[in-house]
């Protein structure tokens, strides 16, 4: 070890939350459940063409609730999700995203990256941002206000948000829907 000794104060406010609802399973049940999950996830893929089918708001809300169950640095849950269905707002998001995408696709320094994307047929035009019945916009929260109103840092923000989005994608998939992650930089 480094020879350093760290002394941690025992928290007087710490109260462990008992884990309830645990079902003890046999090895064969565990294997079966893991195989079922694997087979379900093998069917997951992104799409760029969305149907006009209405999806109830409650479905999207429940998927976001699943994302909210993701583990996070210091259990801060440093994310915020916004649900967008308003056509005017979706058009504004599309226009802003396409402006950024045009810069990306015209940047000669990104030639290798663009060649890697070529088999997927991606381009600067993002009609799916208007066509999808819902857009879910994820925001990372690097800081939050504590109970005294002071700014306090959140920890492992990119990792925590990434895990939450992974939960969200899985929830969307398990409802029978599909999604596409879109990450225009610097949006």
Task: Please describe what each predicted stretch is.
Residues 68-75:
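Glycine-rich phosphate/pyrophosphate-binding beta-alpha loops
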Residues 49-51, 80, 178-182:
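Short catalytic-loop micro-motif centered on adjacent basic/acidic residues
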Residues 1-62, 92-95, 103-106:
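N-terminal accessory segments that position/regulate proteins before the catalytic core
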Residues 76-77, 129-132, 172-175:
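Short gly/pro-enriched beta-turn/loop segments at secondary-structure junctions
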Residues 10, 80-162:
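Glycine/small-residue-rich phosphate/adenosyl-binding loop
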